Amino acid sequence: MSDFYHKPVLLEESVHWLVSESGMYIDATLGGAGHSKEILHRLETQHLLSNSLLIGIDRDANAIRAATTRLATYAAHAHILRGRFADLKLLLETNGLLDSGNHPIRGILLDLGISSHQIDAPARGFSFQQSGPLDMRMSDTAQLTAAEVVNHYDERSLSKIFFDYGEEREAKWIARKIVEARKQTPLETTAALALLIRQNLNRKSPVEQTKTLARIFQAIRIEVNGELDELKAVLQAAHEVLSEKGRLVVISYHSLEDRIVKQFFNECASEDWGPKGVVLDVPIKTATMKILTKKPVLASEEEIQENSRARSAKLRVAEKI
């Protein structure tokens, strides 16, 4: 388990909102199983475990191995599946876990972004702070890599990715410099890409350069893994499979993710009574979820001091009605 360490963010808050009664709980972003273990522990302490089941989903083989070890003491109540969380409904169906009368789906947790282990492993290529291959795949079975994006996407496509997924104002400039540089030598490592970007941002302070690097690497990672499309798909799937009063708990780490979650919750919680002036007995569209967190739940200063990754975390909760 030591090869996949990840300190869970907003652990107490997320499990508090998630666990209500016995049934099935899904950790769709299993990682090192920090949240999953706490969910099972909470069910146990509330005497709900005997008729409950935890489903953990992850596409990272290292995470699956670590989680299996970590949850060994709860093996009878934990079922781990390897796959993309966007395929949540299909994974449940193919494993005979959907529409299980004994285990209605009471809660689904999504802890978005990447794990500490993935960031800290140079060979995964997620971090600009240490040199590794330009990979950034969350699953080793995926085809598209960061190297493919950086070395083969045209300038316009790179610029769009940097602007749309990184919200980077220097998107066009950086895309142009990458295309110019790769004509001489392909960019094969995170260090080479980071150095190129820093060299072309020398008018900026080191702090500003680092922020730009974070945005560019985030943008490439989102493109490689299709993260925003995956998020939209899993939100819809989660909404479909949740039982009545089941809760969807989502932790996001940047504005793009949070915007999608907030918009989805608002759409599900709204009614449509048609155009003004038209009197209807029933709405065209009824609300299917109730938002339980009017404002996102944020990490405490104490948690941020212990885990800097918690600084940007936002937790939102909605309940199916």
From Swiss-Prot:
Catalytic activities: cytidine(1402) in 16S rRNA + S-adenosyl-L-methionine = N(4)-methylcytidine(1402) in 16S rRNA + S-adenosyl-L-homocysteine + H(+)
Keyword Transferase: yes
Keyword vocabulary terms for this entry: Cytoplasm, Methyltransferase, rRNA processing, S-adenosyl-L-methionine, Transferase
Main location: cytoplasm
GO cellular-component term (any): cytoplasm
Keyword Cytoplasm: yes
Matches recorded under InterPro entries: RsmH, SAM-dep_MeTrfase_MraW_recog, SAM-dependent_MTases_sf
EC number(s) from the headed UniProt entry: 2.1.1.199
GO molecular function, one term: rRNA (cytosine-N4-)-methyltransferase activity
A Gene Ontology BP annotation from the UniProt entry: rRNA base methylation
Listed HAMAP family: 16SrRNA_methyltr_H
Family membership noted in the UniProt record: Belongs to the methyltransferase superfamily. RsmH family.
Protein's name in the database: Ribosomal RNA small subunit methyltransferase H
Organism of origin: Chloroherpeton thalassium (strain ATCC 35110 / GB-78)
